[in-house]
């Protein structure tokens, strides 16, 4: 059909045409729908059975003769590879059927296209199949759908599965020959198939009597694979498979073309892959190998090309892996992920698949009836539960895996990824304008071609920025930019990647300056890529300002060290002090320089002095002056060489903890030596200073911050206070309030009176901490808690707002810190204002009473509380020349027990009793286990259970108050019985450990010192306190003598005036004074005596004092002063006043004579007696307040309300469970002791007999001298100790923590003898006895030299002879509470009763632990007796009064931790009190330590903190903290 040119053509017309043309060629239905035999189907669609028959090119592991096994690109036909592999796997399978099989021979002849595989395993049965009527070899090799693997009930670990393998090889071969021999059937079978199994040859059967074997020989039909011959690539693959079989089939020797393959097993096979492979550092890869069990063998090494695996299932090469590989890899990955996360805290998040990418795993497995995703068997799909075996890798394998380089490789990858992320924060392009940075005042030329001339000023806060902006009015804004810092920047050297990424401050600085990570700024051209050519640091001139400078230097040095060589950093300094007179003004940039000027300027008092605490003190006018004189105020940092790099690393690197300790030690020793020699303090920023090396900055300025950190964090041995606490006490003493005052108001007063320069919130928290008296806080609170100051419910964190609570001095405070001692103290000055003393000198060591805790830089302090009366009794023993008794920690009102495990290691036990078979009662928790915390973290999980642990208890009820604890807990009988077997204290976490291996304190000369025992602290305090009682007596004798002389003169003057011997009316003053001198009157004796105490008038009195005393001073300078006589009122002439004056004179003389008769020891004993008497009164009042409203008390607390109150008391029917100190606990404690001794010996410190090296100076000179009998008190180490974990070397909470084992004992300082003739000088005020001035500068060293002490007595180690009474039962004993007391407490021999007044003895508790109920007063062993006697004396050897006296003198047993005093028991009180039976197992045992504070080795020869040099500003404090006072 023709188409018209105009006729449209459509698709239907074309189709019709085609149909007509093909009509004759239409296929029949039969030809379209065909049925093929299976043989025809296999040949027609081979990819279904053997994979592709087309050539493919891909990366494969092959074996080449010249290079061995290697991974390269090969071109091969997968189908051909598969048919070869089927026959090879069949040969290997025969090993599973016949363990005796030992050899496989593979022959590959590429030229003749012949492949042969022979094995000597058990032959195929040469017997006719009775069903199929054909011989078995012909059946399984020549007929499809035949196999021995069809019985799924039989668990096989062979590669054959579907019955196709060998037949497929036959089908795709032009010739296929089977030859097998069976010794069992005594026949040999041989048959050949040709033409793709289309034609079978004749079967040959021969008799046979040799060893079994099977041999398959075939010639692949290359035409089916579109190949001409067996090329190099396919042969290389086949050879590698021969090696695979050699490695994966145990105890089978494989020959290839007649040659034995050099593979001795799977481990040997793995080495073929790793030949010449090295890691990132050039070392050979480390292989971890484990034969887990007969079915699993695993090797692991590091991979640099992503996850790699070489695996075999029943000799099949699973090139794509499968579930068997995942099963093994997941075990390894889970362990490695944990390790990587620990080592990469805060870094880039690492996921499991990223860890897996660094692993190369080799697995050889035998799996029962494996399944695959295809006939090619490259991926094993069987689920792990069906493997028929398990592969649990050993801890040894995992540990080796962690150390084989994989973890390091992952961490390097993490760093690389982190660097990529950091680089995204940087801009490689220099911008003239940048956006998105608040508070930045950019220089106009920043980012331009003049950018190298621009300077970025980094200021400490917004106020400093304002000062800088004011100064820019002088130098202009084109070249100077300003950016304020929000405090201290991050220590990037130890910060995590996450911290750096999220730190806005650091990212802003990088963006402003135009810095790029990993860029080297070596040459000038690289500097031109920056937006600023310099950074100027402008901070306050205090220690915290120095720290900020150091952190910025560290930031640049860590990331771009080359910038430091270009003088990239500089600082802007401002004055600390300015003095002015008339129009003359002098600025000083360090306090030592100011002191030098004062000493060289005779009339310096006429100059006006102004102190600058920070940049905010300067005015805008002064800012302009500073910037106008840029040469004086700009100090460049100069790089002087590798010593600068070392110094910066020393200050900020976590790895140099020990070096930093030695650095601080040397600094303190050097400062002390300079002070002793009278040398001036070393300082920076003199008048000619224009540059500063980094080394000088670190060693002369930054070190002051580190030292001040310790001063603010570690208390003084003398008064147990930190500076902030001392400021509070100083203010309270000065105010002497008779009425309560709000905490918030007191904090303001403290800031004003003691020159406190920081936020008042931390002061308020300090005040609250000083007033707290709940269990676990203070044993003696110096302030009264009037209001809610916190309770044991929340550990004090439940205190009310400081605006709502009141406080005032405790009645005991001034008895502990007698005003008479104030005149002997050395008061400090701040901003020309006299503030708190260097330390107070209490009558007992308060650091033992209230304990101490703090973390500084390099060292930490932890000391528990001790019982007040035990400490007092030990002081009395020392005063009497006796040895003090060992003391156990003790906490006021704690009803549990504390036992010693080992030296300085204790276990603290709560109280638990059994009420019935399903109920227990917890009536006390370990110290500092707060009630609410215990409920939430212990009882709630026990009640509700967790995913891993089922619930243990069925219910609990709470009956506690703010001061007592009572949980009543319900359990099933079975679980209670099991808990009893394990130990109720252990199950319910009612035991905690306490370790005191870090008793580090500042001694009286301001040196850090480590004490080995609490008795060492007590002895040091005793020597110092006794000396100061001598000084007090000397001062009182002088003062009383002067006052007596004054009264005597006044009385004589009045009498002579009355008698008319002296006429003063209408006489000139000079003549009158002359008359008084002639008649023998003394110039004001009191004033003269005070002036005599000062060789030089106090140069540091504040201006108010100067003003007030100017008149009297001028009068004094003119000659004698008789104002004390001439200023007396006229009414002193009356008879009454005259008689009173004479009486006062006589009384004063009597007082003086009485004082002369007393020794310093007598004065001390008097103070102790008065203190104890008042303590009894205070405690009685506290007890009375606690008992208000309790049952059985008088008043309204009866009936229903009384019954409710009874619920809070422990149940009288409970059977107390005695806490057990297990063998494991003691063993652990002893282990720690041995480790400590071992580490000490390793460090070179002798451990025998307490003999130790000499002083610090001797150690420096390497003279290891022994000092027999010296007290063992360790000092700052010069040898490194083991390092501890620390995130930030400058952080209070994490500073330089070392492990317990690294304590190093260093000897005590050699004491310097004081001259006996040196007369003590006292701090006095010329106008009143109530205000005190500082000591004379020249006498300062003399007064605070080491004490002139007699040779120390041989140290008696505390003996652990306080035996626990034996109890029945294994790990937990339950005893009747009544009989516990009656039967278990022996009497102890009496001792003299001289320490306490007899009338107070009756009310003392006879046992240290408030245990369970007692019905009668029994004589009980004291802690002192238990500590020194091996056996108690027989009962009844002493009378009650003697026993009472004995108990008063000696410490009570370890169990009664500061229990409330009990009067002799009566029926009323015993019914209502908590059951008081004493724990049989709770006297002294040796204890296991709690988490480690820094082991610290401190030198007692360290110089005290000099209070001159740069003005100190303490670090910023946390607003809410239990240990807020730790931060001062």
Curated annotation (Swiss-Prot):
Homodimer. Interacts with COPS5. Interacts with RECQL5; this stimulates DNA decatenation. Interacts with SETMAR; stimulates the topoisomerase activity. Interacts with DHX9; this interaction occurs in a E2 enzyme UBE2I- and RNA-dependent manner, negatively regulates DHX9-mediated double-stranded DNA and RNA duplex helicase activity and stimulates TOP2A-mediated supercoiled DNA relaxation activity. Interacts with HNRNPU (via C-terminus); this interaction protects the topoisomerase TOP2A from degradation and positively regulates the relaxation of supercoiled DNA in a RNA-dependent manner. Mg(2+) 2 binds at residues 540, 542. Its cofactor is Mg(2+); Mn(2+); Ca(2+). Residues 1108-1118, 1296-1306 have a biased composition (Low complexity). Residues 1090-1118, 1183-1211, 1229-1528 are annotated as: Disordered. Residues 1258-1270, 1506-1519 have a biased composition (Basic and acidic residues). Eukaryotic topoisomerase I and II can relax both negative and positive supercoils, whereas prokaryotic enzymes relax only negative supercoils. This is DNA topoisomerase 2-alpha. ATP binds at residues 90, 119, 147-149, 160-167, 375-377. One of its GO terms (biological process) is positive regulation of apoptotic process. There is a cross-link at residues 17, 155-156, 351, 385, 396, 415, 417, 424, 439, 465, 479, 528, 583, 598, 613, 621, 624, 631, 638, 654, 661, 675, 1074, 1193, 1201, 1226, 1238, 1272, 1279, 1282, 1359, 1363, 1382, 1418, 1438, 1450, 1455, 1480, 1488 (Glycyl lysine isopeptide (Lys-Gly) (interchain with G-Cter in SUMO2)). The modification N6-acetyllysine is found at residues 1418, 1438. It catalyses: ATP-dependent breakage, passage and rejoining of double-stranded DNA. The keyword Isomerase applies. Residues 1429-1435 are annotated as: Interaction with PLSCR1. Key decatenating enzyme that alters DNA topology by binding to two double-stranded DNA molecules, generating a double-stranded break in one of the strands, passing the intact strand through the broken strand, and religating the broken strand. May play a role in regulating the period length of BMAL1 transcriptional oscillation. SMART domains: TOP2c, TOP4c. Its EC number is 5.6.2.2. The record marks 803 as: Transition state stabilizer. The modification N-acetylmethionine is found at residue 1. Its main location: cytoplasm. The record marks 855 as: Important for DNA bending. Residues 341-343, 989-998 are annotated as: Interaction with DNA. It is an enzyme of class 5 (isomerase). The lineage of its organism: Eukaryota, Metazoa, Chordata, Craniata, Vertebrata.
